[in-house]
Structure formats: C-alpha cells, structure tokens
Amino acid sequence: MELNSEKISQNYEGILQDIKKYSPYPEKVKILFVSKYLGIEEQEALINMGYNYFGENRAQVYRDKLERFFGEKYENLVWDFIGRLQKNKIKYIITNVNLIHSIDSFDLLSEINKKAIENNRIVNGLIQINVSKEESKTGIYIEDFQKESEKYFSMSNVKIKGFMTMAPLDAEEDEIEGYFSKMYNLKKEYEKKYNYCSELSMGMSNDYIEALKNGATILR
C-alpha cells in the first residue's frame, strides 16, 4: 500500500485547524496516528514525513515495530498501546510503552502494575470507560469507576493519566455530544483530585469535532 503523502498532509492540517477552532485548550491536543493497518514500509514513510506519535492495537505487532524502529534515527518516536490488552500479552509492551489507553478492568490494571514492578517501570495508563454501556464493548461504567476510584489511583507503578472512550458508531450527533460531555465532566472531577489525571482520549475520524468541543486531548 502506497501512502498519499499530500492527502495525509492535507488531512493533518485540516485537523490542526479544527483543533484551534473547537478545542477549549488547543495547545494540549495531540493527534495519534493509528498504525494498526500499516506495514513496516508504510510506517517508515509516515516517519519520514515527520510524524512521530503512533498507536498500535496488537501487542506482538507493537513489540515487532519497536524492535524495527530502534536507534538514534527513531529516538523521537512515541508509541501508545490502544487495543484490547490481554494479561498474557502485557510482557510485549511493558518495557517501553508511552501510554496504555485500554485499561478496562481493575484486574488488568493490577496485572500491569505487577509487570511494571518486575521491570522497574512507572507506566502511564488511561481507564477505558464504556460511556454508552454497550454490551459489545469492554470498559468500566462511569458509576462503577466512581464507586471504587481510589483503588485505581493507588497502584505503585501505574499512574492513571486520564480516560479513554469510544462513542457508538451509529450514534446521532446529539448522543455523541452527551457521551463526550459525560467524559469531560469525569475527567474534570478527577483532575481536581489528581492533577496528573488530565488526558482524555476520544474522537476518531467520524466524531472528533464533538470530542474536541468536549475537551479531548488525544484524537485517534
């Protein structure tokens, strides 16, 4: 697959303009390139275009790409993990992940903390919230998180930097607005208690405008 660098650049610039237009704090917003469909050559092409913030959703592919893109040339690359993470796959990402977006249960958080201790690392993570309560999605309901939030922030080697969510693909614009507004309020609630809990990962190509209006800091 050959990448259309001109189209990518135009789309990127368009999103940058939307960030300035719609975000309450545009200086805090980051654009994450979801690289799960990219092979090594396509990834290299994006890197050569100057993009350096990537999200991968398969743990073993994450490991393989970081082994490939290693060394001085690639030292400014930032890699997040955005996919569903199985406990037995944590080992593939734990040594160098920048941010885990998909902590969808306390059990998973505890296991990540255990592996982080073993590797002498402090790992940054986001709690995945199932804001729409879809049965087909993983994630924690807002009210369930609020009931037991202290234990999520008590891990010795995992720092909860904020929250991640996805709106239903078939949701109407006003529904999406409602879901993202709930997430913004949740983030504000916990940022007051933990000033490092400042990230809100939400908004993809079909709904990022609504996400920006509601304080998203990471667009995927």
Question: Where are the model-predicted features located?
Answer:
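Conserved alpha/beta-domain cores
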Residues: 1-206, 212-214
